[in-house]
Amino acid sequence: FDSDTASDTAVWRPSSGVWYSLNSSDGGFQAIQFGSSGDQITPGDYDGDGISDRAVFRPSTGAWYVLKSGGGTLIMGFGQNGDIPVQADYDGDLKTDVAVYRPSNGLWYIWGSTSGLMVRQFGLSTDRPVTGDFDADGVADIAVYRPSTGVWYIQASTAGFRTAQFGLA
């Protein structure tokens, strides 16, 4: 968050909406109010400048609020109550994309910053959505962990579908 491109130690206090961060560059401390009680934190590099932006998803309204590191705020409606935010770079443009997993129907709704809307059916209502670049191609992949079986289901962007047994059922 301090513009040196290294990860900073940070916590968010939901009761007050304050982000507390310890700067990796100089050990300094920042306290910035951004968000409200009930929000879910969704940090990422939404503007592609290489610096993490503070961001929250407000499930009650389906709105995303992004405090851009270079200044300014982005507000975007995307999602609904009950959705789980799964922000990541799904289109490989080095910008975090707004995305939600909807447990009620197992759909992933992804708004790619260059690719637009993508909808993917992948998961069950009891699955835990997971993002990551599981095939190392620079594009985020969609995956779910199924607690009832301890199995990971991964739909990689270039490597295709695979499963992995890792975890306790």
Feature annotation, model-predicted:
Residues 1-169:
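Trp/Gly-enriched beta-strand/coil motifs that build multi-repeat beta-propeller-like domains
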